[in-house]
């Protein structure tokens, strides 16, 4: 829970977290090492100095550390697990639904557990999706269109098999389709993350919500032109948000474009933990104000009401979460109340970097 200087409580749903295993023992080949090296480079480049982790910790931090960083030291109230299997790179997978389910079982009121599918798995994959949905009562999935599988280096949501999987997801009540459409990660191919196929899928599947993780970066314009027309396309701010202290002008450009084209009702906060931790991200976001010239040019408004929507209300709507009821469920395990922190300035956050 984030509490403003005036005492107002803001319910926070972190829309993008992981609990991965990238240890040497789990790396199947050089590509597993390349992948986590790239993640660590993003972490090192955009994190404040006092938030930098050792490489050993970064490779596998574990569930206890995750809980501490999100809900005790951090302001998150709930978090959504977004799995990334990468079975061609990691022996037991990088960050799987099955791994995440262990922590979900331990803290059922804290986590939303999403699944995943890969249309290249054919009929067997459809059966597996049925089983996964039944076991975990899924409301969402995370897709990684650039994931390698054998000789294939990606797929598109407009592929015939992908459409069969989306049809099955809708039939199963899996309404929220999170898709990585953002920066590439070595060794994956940049163009396999192209955002264009979102346009086709969103048009063809009006009963589904497509949450474009990372807002299509570096293809921000392409994403905005699609999302402003497709009523069922949303933007996830993971990766975009950490630029807030390293390159605030760039972040101001990104968030103003998103607000101008999509509005505050279609944007979701995500820390992308464990690349970054939520405490400094939320503090910086709450302290951030759009530069006057950008606000005037775009007409974008990033006031407290907009921030509340982005930080939790929008995700709650997509996942059918009654926030007041959820607060009551969480009350027994709430940590010592956090001190009001909205008076933290961006300069103070930047000074730690």
Give a label for each model feature.
Residues 16, 104, 113, 132, ...:
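Conserved, mostly hydrophobic/aromatic
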Residues 61-68, 96-101, 125-129, 195-198, ...:
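Alpha-helical scaffolding within the catalytic cores
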Residues 19-20, 183, 217, 275:
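Short active-site segment of divalent metal-dependent hydrolases/proteases
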Residues 28, 139-140, 154-269, 294-301, ...:
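Catalytic pocket-lining loop regions of alpha/beta-barrel enzymes
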Residues 16-22, 180, 214:
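Histidine-centered divalent metal-coordination motifs
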Residues 23-29, 93-94, 126-128, 153-155, ...:
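Short aromatic-enriched loop/helix-cap "lid" or pocket-rim segments at secondary-structure transitions
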Residues 1-15, 21-70, 127-131, 261-266, ...:
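Mid-to-C-terminal alpha-helical segments outside catalytic/metal-binding sites
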Residues 78-80, 85-192:
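Active-site gating/metal-coordination segments in enzymes
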């Amino acid at each position: 829970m984030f509490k403003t200087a005036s005492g107002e409580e803001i319910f926070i749903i972190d829309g993008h977290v992981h609990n991965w295993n990238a240890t040497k023992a789990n790396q199947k080949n050089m590509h597993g090492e390349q992948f986590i090296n790239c993640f660590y480079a993003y972490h090192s480049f955009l994190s404040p100095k006092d938030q930098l982790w050792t490489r050993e910790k970064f490779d596998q931090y574990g569930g206890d550390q995750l809980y501490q960083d999100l809900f005790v030291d951090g302001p998150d109230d709930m978090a959504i697990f977004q799995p990334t299997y990468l079975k061609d790179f990691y022996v037991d997978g990088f960050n799987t639904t099955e791994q995440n389910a262990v922590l979900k079982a331990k803290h059922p009121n804290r986590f939303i557990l999403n699944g995943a599918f890969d249309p290249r798995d054919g009929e067997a994959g459809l059966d597996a999706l049925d089983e996964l949905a039944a076991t975990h009562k899924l409301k969402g999935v995370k897709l990684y269109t650039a994931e390698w599988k054998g000789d294939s280096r990606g797929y598109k949501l407009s592929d015939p098999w992908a459409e069969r999987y989306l049809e099955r997801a809708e039939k199963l009540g899996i309404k929220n389709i999170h898709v990585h459409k953002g920066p590439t990660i070595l060794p994956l191919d940049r163009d396999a993350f192209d955002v264009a196929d979102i346009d086709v899928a969103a048009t063809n599947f009006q009963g589904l919500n497509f949450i474009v993780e990372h807002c299509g970066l570096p293809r921000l314009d392409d994403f905005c032109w699609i999302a402003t027309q497709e009523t069922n396309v949303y933007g996830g701010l993971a990766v975009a948000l950490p630029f807030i202290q390293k390159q605030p002008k760039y972040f101001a450009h990104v968030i103003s474009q998103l607000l101008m084209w999509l509005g505050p009702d279609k944007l979701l906060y995500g820390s992308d933990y464990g690349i970054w931790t939520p405490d400094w991200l939320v503090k910086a976001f709450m302290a951030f104000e759009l530069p006057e010239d950008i606000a005037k040019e775009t007409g974008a408004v990033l006031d407290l009401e907009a921030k509340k929507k982005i930080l939790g209300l929008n995700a709650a709507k997509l996942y059918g979460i009654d926030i007041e009821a959820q607060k009551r469920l969480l009350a027994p395990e709430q940590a010592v109340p956090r001190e009001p922190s909205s008076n933290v300035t961006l300069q103070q956050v930047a000074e730690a970097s």
